[in-house]
Amino acid sequence: MKKLILAASIMALTACSAPQQEQINVMPEASLSSSNLVQGKTYTLTSKDVRAAQYVALVDSGRANIQPIHAKQNMRISLENAIAKQFESQGFRDSVNSENSVVLEIQEALVTVEHTIMENQMDGKVTLEVTAETPEGKLVKTFNGTATRTGALSASNDDIAMVLNDVIDLVLKEIANDQELQTYMKERF
């Protein structure tokens, strides 16, 4: 019995000291409007993450070793909160029982990093689909953002997070300033 307890204790301690997977901070910043487009129009916001994999970065160190890096925060919830703030700043109100709905679909959010001995190249890509639906119909729009950054030596997790957050913020700004989406929501919600 003592051996069993000792073995279980060793396994528990070993599991605690196992190296943790690297993670980066994903902090989307909502693009807020300075004035209301509407007053009190309601919608129901939902979101879904349809990415094939849940990591947000792939780091290729060139030694046939590709390492995925995940986000510390839940990507879907972070983006949903940012979109809700954007619409709120435009005068739309999120409600659980509205006949109008907005669906945010995360199709891609990834930074690929290639390291060589002397430099790194980071390519970020974010694709979000926004569907605004009313009883009379719906509008589906896809928003894309890309960025490329090169740097000396290897890229840190902070560098990777900066590229990803910058691309996400560009896409959020594009959504906030999209005239077709604004007009559809203003006239039909």
Predicted segments, located by residue:
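Sec-dependent bacterial lipoprotein signal peptides
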Residues: 1-16
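Mid-chain, structured segments of secreted extracytoplasmic proteins
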Residues: 69-97, 104
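A structural "domain/chain start" motif
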Residues: 16-77, 181-189
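Contiguous, function-dense segments enriched for cysteine-driven chemistry
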Residues: 43-44, 92, 127, 147, ...
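Sec-exported extracytoplasmic/periplasmic mature domains
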Residues: 84-92, 111, 172-181
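Short secondary-structure boundary motifs at beta->alpha junctions and helix caps
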Residues: 60-72, 138-177
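Surface-exposed short loop/turn segments
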Residues: 17-26, 90-140, 149-154
